[in-house]
Regions:
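Extracellular TM2-ECL1-early TM3 structural module of rhodopsin-like
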Residues: 46-58, 84-146, 150-164
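Intracellular effector-coupling site of seven-transmembrane GPCRs
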Residues: 199-218, 226-229, 246-285
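Loop architecture of class A 7-transmembrane GPCRs
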Residues: 32-44, 111, 115-131, 154, ...
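First transmembrane helix
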Residues: 49-78, 98, 238, 242
Length: 366
């Protein structure tokens, strides 16, 4: 498909036709020559972007790659940490790794440059991967919450369900559905070349990667994405947690150690979910208001959007730090890997994955 060519008599045309998750970059860059028509100071915004975006996105990229890779290595290398919850944690780390590798570098470039330099195919690919990884992350959290719900509310009945094989099968089904459902993102995003007419009669062409809203309804897309990638999963998670917390704190038939194990695992998942909700809330709200064309284009609000992007992307690197802070097993395993301790010593410290322990405490082995 050839990129679109659109005429724009002023920069606000570009602002009303932005992409889904990387819109600010194209907007600011495409408006460079038309500052007088905007409600914000382009020079101030641009000077902040070229410093803040490379710095913070670079830090997020490095920490996200190293931290999530460390999570995968730690769980894979330590049989004592194999559990349904930790398999789901690996999947969450993989989703964050994909986002860090394939989305953050190109989004950062799109912020800094006034045009999209990677071509139409990669424009569609990056937008598709952003949607896929966003869905993969949040619905992995739903699976983690479901796993905790079964472990707490139905600890005996769910023993045959909460196995590593079933967790892997659930993850595969989830990825297959997400990859299929997200396919429209490839169609509705693409390159658009704006032809700006300058006051002196000359024209300036700027190619950006964005939502093709001349053909498709961006409001419908953004509202659908907001509901299915944020509201719906968080509602499901809240239902699971309300049920399990009532059961957890009222339970008296299990041993104190068993209850403590479930509470530790449940607390970890709860914190990870809470951090996700906080990190993604601002940018989700901003994108919805922009799709409804009620987002004020002022210098202050654009700064808010930049901070919101940084906050959302920070979520891709923060989970390993949460595991290290909240889980003794993860903290010890991280130290052993970082300080290159022998694998046998790591496994001895973490404890053997005995059949009895795995059968009764699957998912609590954090």
């Amino acid at each position: 498909m050839r990129p679109e060519v659109a005429n724009a008599t002023n920069a606000n045309d570009t602002f009303l036709n932005c992409s889904s998750l990387t819109s600010l970059a194209g907007e600011v860059g495409a408006c460079k020559s038309y500052t007088q028509e905007l409600g914000f100071d382009y020079e101030v915004v641009h000077s902040i972007i070229i410093v803040v975006v490379p710095l913070f996105f670079g830090i997020i990229g490095i920490l996200g790659f190293a931290g999530n890779l460390l999570v995968v290595v730690v769980v894979a290398a330590n049989p004592g940490m194999r559990s349904t919850t930790n398999i789901l944690i690996i999947n969450l780390a993989v989703a964050d790794l994909l986002f860090v590798i394939f989305c953050i570098p190109f989004t950062a470039t799109d912020f800094v440059l006034p045009y999209w330099p990677f071509g139409n195919v990669w424009c569609k690919t990056v937008q598709y991967l952003i949607i896929v990884t966003a869905y993969a992350s949040v619905y992995t959290l739903v699976l983690m919450s479901l796993d905790r719900y079964l472990a707490v509310v139905h600890p005996i009945a769910s023993m045959s369900w909460r196995t590593e094989n079933h967790a892997i099968q659930a993850i595969c089904i989830m990825w297959a559905l997400i990859l299929a459902v997200s396919m429209p993102a490839i169609i509705i995003h693409g390159e658009v070349t704006y032809v700006f007419q300058k006051p002196n009669g000359q024209s300036e062409n700027l190619t950006v990667c964005r939502f093709l809203n001349e053909q498709y309804n961006w409001t419908v897309f953004q509202m659908t994405f907001f509901l299915t990638s944020y509201v719906l999963p968080l509602v499901l998670i809240c239902i699971f947690y309300m049920s399990m917390l009532i059961s957890l704190w009222r339970s008296a038939r299990d041993s104190a150690e068993s209850r403590r194990g479930r509470r530790r695992a449940t607390r970890l998942v709860f914190v990870v979910v809470g951090v996700f909700a906080v990190c993604w809330c601002p940018i989700q709200v901003i994108l919805v208001t922009k799709s409804l064309e009620v987002f004020p284009l002022t210098t202050a609000m654009i700064m808010v959007q930049i901070v919101s992007h940084v906050l959302a992307y920070t979520n891709s690197c923060i989970n390993p730090f949460l595991y290290a802070f909240l889980s003794d097993h993860f903290r010890k395993a991280f130290r052993k890997i970082i300080y290159c301790r022998p694998r046998a010593e790591v496994n001895n410290r973490l404890g053997p994955p005995t059949k009895t322990t795995r059968a009764t405490n699957s998912g609590n082995n954090l």
